Amino acid sequence: MSHVKGSPESILATQQSLTHLFDRVDATHVQLDPTRTSLTGTGGLVEIGKDGGQNWNYDMGFKWSSPELELNDIGFLKRADQKFQFFNLKYRTAKPISVFRNINLDFSQFNAFDFEGNHNRTQYQLRTRLRFLNNSRISSWLTHKPRIYDNTTLR
């Protein structure tokens, strides 16, 4: 959670910054208010999964940063007004197989929304990493992005 206070001019500058863009013409869930003297927002991550143990690992979760979240000097915030759903599935070999010291296969998927409910992004990725017995390696990945709508590039 964040709560920032300041003069109307400084809060207006925060509302208009690239992180927030309260003045977007397409956004109906936020309003640019030049008289405001504070912003209060939330952000977080809820994640469950399994790491370690056998060959299969996974994680899934949800993270968010509300439109008024402002980390200011205590952290890094590229963009507010986002909700992410994600899922990752990983297969790892722990023992050499044939000419490979280890094999890593990863599948990941995520969706991004804003707090107005707009579905802004979908992405799928498949990655492979093969390490040979002599420690040389080959990596490849395939990414599919059937939906990309970036509301910060509208300016």
Segments predicted by a language model, with ranges:
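Exposed, low-structure sequence patches enriched in small/polar residues
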Residues: 3-155
